[in-house]
Amino acid sequence: MTLKKSKPTSPGQRAVVRSVNSFLYKGNSYSALTEKKKKNSGRNNSGKITVRHIGGGHKHHYRIVDFCRNKDDIPAKVERIEYDPNRSAYLALLCYADGERKYIIAAKDIEVGSYVVNGSGSPVKTGNALPIRNIPVGSVIHCIELKPGKGAQLARSAGSSAQLMAREGDYSQIRLRSGEIRKIHINCRATIGEVGNSEHNLQSIGKAGAVRWRGIRPTVRGVAMNPVDHPHGGGEGKTAAGRHPVSPWGTPSKGSRTRRNKRTVNMIVRSRYSKKG
């Protein structure tokens, strides 16, 4: 992946830094694994805003990605690597030996023409998906399941990965990028290696309009609102918030913990908030 800085021919181009990837497929996505994606602009079925700052943007088609990787012991060839507008990672289109095609998250260093395989008997090689019980301790992994057969939920974005730290009984300990160490069942599957497009965070959008193309609307500061709209609102002229930063609903917005899932708290061996020593 190469980063390209645009010449400052206009204010909008001055700060643009985008990736240039010659290996990406230039054509349309595979139609059998593509479906329409309807925008809801952050509204629920009643038309009320449930997620702020969402609306507009370019139309996207959704690519159906195989997160389960349960087609075992059949080698698959990487036909092409594609851009996906719905996520930061790239997609790899696999063609299995029986002719079936599936999209997967493209791992780092995976190339067109290489082969990957799923299953417990697969070699420990970048792009292969195995149950955690068959992965050596210390391996770097991504696309990790939280429940066996449910599909990958952890370490799916560009450049992300985790590390298998230990195995004890029916559970393994996996260290995530946040520093959290979490117990995951050894029958859950994970993919070897880290996710590709690792320089995604080094890109610069460059102008406000490009953010709107992505379907993101402006964020208004609370102190610029009226008291009816935000706890920080109101006052004559330019004023400070007058209290610690909070959300429009009064929840502390800087550093307050919001996790409420007590059911799985015993699966966390080390919190992401603990001091890193």
Swiss-Prot record:
GO terms for molecular function: rRNA binding; structural constituent of ribosome; transferase activity. InterPro entries: NA-bd_OB-fold, Rib_uL2_dom2, Ribosomal_uL2, Ribosomal_uL2_bac/org-type, Ribosomal_uL2_C, Ribosomal_uL2_CS, Ribosomal_uL2_dom3, Ribosomal_uL2_RNA-bd_dom. One of its GO terms (cellular component) is large ribosomal subunit. Gene3D superfamilies: 2.30.30.30, Nucleic acid-binding proteins, Ribosomal protein L2, domain 3. Pfam families: Ribosomal_L2 (PF00181), Ribosomal_L2_C (PF03947). GO terms for biological process: cytoplasmic translation. Keywords: Ribonucleoprotein, Ribosomal protein, RNA-binding, rRNA-binding. Coiled coil: none annotated. Residues 223-264 are annotated as: Disordered. The keyword Endoplasmic reticulum does not apply. HAMAP family: Ribosomal_uL2_B (MF_01320_B). Part of the 50S ribosomal subunit. Forms a bridge to the 30S subunit in the 70S ribosome. One of the primary rRNA binding proteins. Required for association of the 30S and 50S subunits to form the 70S ribosome, for tRNA binding and peptide bond formation. It has been suggested to have peptidyltransferase activity; this is somewhat controversial. Makes several contacts with the 16S rRNA in the 70S ribosome. Belongs to the universal ribosomal protein uL2 family. This is Large ribosomal subunit protein uL2. It comes from Nitrosomonas eutropha (strain DSM 101675 / C91 / Nm57). The lineage of its organism: Bacteria, Pseudomonadati, Pseudomonadota, Betaproteobacteria, Nitrosomonadales.
